[in-house]
Amino acid sequence: MAELTISASDIEGAIEDYVSSFTADSGREEIGVVIDAGDGIAHVEGLPSVMTQELLEFPGGVLGVALNLDEHSVGAVILGEFEKIEQGQQVKRTGEVLSVPVGDAFLGRVINPLGQPIDGQGDIEAEGRRALELQAPSVVQRQGVSEPLQTGIKAIDSMTPIGRGQRQLIIGDRKTGKTAVCVDTILNQREAWATGDPKQQVRCVYVAIGQKGTTIASVKRALEEGGAMECTTIVAAPASDAAGFKWLAPYTGSAIGQHWMYDGKHVLIVFDDLSKQADAYRAISLLLRRPPGREAFPGDVFYLHSRLLERCAKLSDELGGGSMTGLPIIETKANDISAFIPTNVISITDGQCFLESDLFNQGVRPAINVGVSVSRVGGAAQIKAMKEVAGSLRLELSQYRELEAFAAFASDLDAASKAQLDRGARLVELLKQPQYTPYPVEDQVVAIYLGTGGHLDSVPVEDVARFESELLEHVKASHGDILAGIRESKKLSEEAEQKLANVINEFKKGFSASDGSSVVVNEAEAEAMDEADVEKESVKVRKPAPKK
């Protein structure tokens, strides 16, 4: 057995070799100290070089965002569990701003505002990351709104049309159907998605801010049952989340949508709702001791929404021609659209659909108030067929509402006013639509033509919905070429209009009202004049008596 010998010179040489090859890793790291924490906010002393909106790392891997940069301290919003953060704990800079993972793998998934999946379906393979705070496209990077985004809702597509790249505000009191309008719009994109054509496909992002967990679950279930979840991403910041998550959720959804928009694709994003984001931002600002303004909101609450909604755009052809259409939702109180946040968002967006609680309670659903609702740029994107048949719809409905209020006090009305009231009542009934039943645009054109063309004037009001549905089934079954022509050419030619009128008149002959009566009007023929009376003067002129 060989003896183990230890040579002092060998040991000395090994140590010298190690010391000569050793390089000390020296680095400079800024560390701050928590001086107070609570309610999702922490004040940190130190960190003199921290950037605004920079991510900070708290003990336990909890992240925060630096918002207030004071002379000796930093005010940060905690993203996550803030109960374990205590005074005296160390805080590190990350040198990064907040970003989220993006990509097609997010379709069909539910994520939180940090981009982490919360639906229990495993991890998501992202294509890259995108910063939450990015500059909106400039004027030269945009083009005008020219392509329609069909909502499937007759009242919107006919009177307040929405184009790709537009921001259309959905505003109204609680429980007036605002979320239902947006969910129906998402459901209406499923047929375009099924075509596989990138020019027609629309990817949808639904951002739930401060909603109840059951409400978010019901929206997800409705999208799954309607077959639209495969083209939708849900960003959820429920009411139980901290204010920081509710503040960031819309920017997360916008970043995911912008990734697709700059890739030449079309996106629809729903913010449900921005009132709760403003409330969360107000809470954060007050806790950070920022000076309050009107309704206790901070001075930059307008910028909070403007920099978010300006990201919705129709990009120029040089940048791929992609688009992101925004449907922000705002909740009013007692139908007051002159409050601070509603007026802010109205001034930022390209139009609004005002849902009224009185109409909703009367059974008019969707409860859109035609007089206040408007689309400033969507008219350029409306198809010609719809423009032709719906041109007089808004005016007739507005006159009907005015006459309706007047008729409540008038005992006797002339025949023209009565006819206008009868026509208006049938138009209101025609525009009613059940939830989760979006209409294809060609069906909408036929339905609106029924009302504005006077074909419903002889149909009792209570039978309008049945007449419309049975006629559409008849046209689809026996005259599908009319619908196909509208769908392909986007026009209603004179020949097609005449054929449609004949089909409606023939259908009326076989349709019976609920009381069993016919809806065909038999106009009495005028009696022919005798030839001997044609040249006879029938007007007697009485000369005034001569003055005395």
Curated annotation (Swiss-Prot):
Region entry Disordered, spans: 526-548
InterPro entries hit by this protein: ATP_synth_asu-like_sf, ATP_synth_asu_C, ATP_synth_asu_C_sf, ATP_synth_F1_a_nt-bd_dom, ATP_synth_F1_asu, ATPase_a/bsu_AS, ATPase_F1/V1/A1_a/bsu_N, ATPase_F1/V1/A1_a/bsu_N_sf
Subcellular location: Cell membrane
Listed GO CC annotations: plasma membrane; proton-transporting ATP synthase complex
Broad EC category: translocase
EC number annotated for this UniProt entry: 7.1.2.2
UniProt site (Required for activity): 373
Alphabetic keyword roster: ATP synthesis, ATP-binding, Cell membrane, CF(1), Hydrogen ion transport, Ion transport, Membrane, Nucleotide-binding, Translocase, Transport
GO molecular function, one term: ADP binding
Membrane topology recorded in Swiss-Prot or TrEMBL: Peripheral membrane protein
Annotated positions binding ATP: 172-179
Known catalytic reactions: ATP + H2O + 4 H(+)(in) = ADP + phosphate + 5 H(+)(out)
Family: Belongs to the ATPase alpha/beta chains family.
Subunit structure: F-type ATPases have 2 components, CF(1) - the catalytic core - and CF(0) - the membrane proton channel. CF(1) has five subunits: alpha(3), beta(3), gamma(1), delta(1), epsilon(1). CF(0) has three main subunits: a(1), b(2) and c(9-12). The alpha and beta chains form an alternating ring which encloses part of the gamma chain. CF(1) is attached to CF(0) by a central stalk formed by the gamma and epsilon chains, while a peripheral stalk is formed by the delta and b chains.
Cited function: Produces ATP from ADP in the presence of a proton gradient across the membrane. The alpha chain is a regulatory subunit.
Protein name: ATP synthase subunit alpha
Organism: Mycolicibacterium vanbaalenii (strain DSM 7251 / JCM 13017 / BCRC 16820 / KCTC 9966 / NRRL B-24157 / PYR-1) (Mycobacterium vanbaalenii)
